[in-house]
Amino acid sequence: GGTNDVDINAPEMWEQINTFYLSVSRAKEFSLKLDHLHDFFSQIRNGSNQFIGVTDSTMSRDEGWHFARMGRMIERADKTSRIVDMKYFILLPKSYDVGTPIDNIQWSALLSSASGFHMYKQKYGTIDPIYVAKFLILDHNFPRAVHYCLLKAEESLHKISGAPVGTF
């Protein structure tokens, strides 16, 4: 395509998409029983991560790459905010459960679901709900933190628009 097209030009990207598609298509031939769901979702997560890796290692840092990164960062920020929201309003709706072992287990699971358990433990050590929320929402270095994602989306938006930083 032309310079304004958002294309998938790298054969490695097409190969990864095709492999992922075939893998997911084969899954519908099998019944997705509860004991197989973990493997199925791990396969989806790994396929997505592999595509992101191939994309980042093969695409020029042009408008198409920035557009894809901006979308990925907005989706990631949305996912993380939904995870935190779910913990506050669904998993532990009773205030007297706050600080109990089940609360701490849920916060640990929340970190794991955002692929942040080990990074959190390196930074803060023990599980503390305030620090977990701070880490997942405000951290500048964790790639799934809402703030980090929005900073990267804004960087790409500036690259795409050509507008100087601080103008919107």
Per-range role (PLM):
Residues 1-168:
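Alpha-helical transmembrane segments and their helix-helix packing motifs
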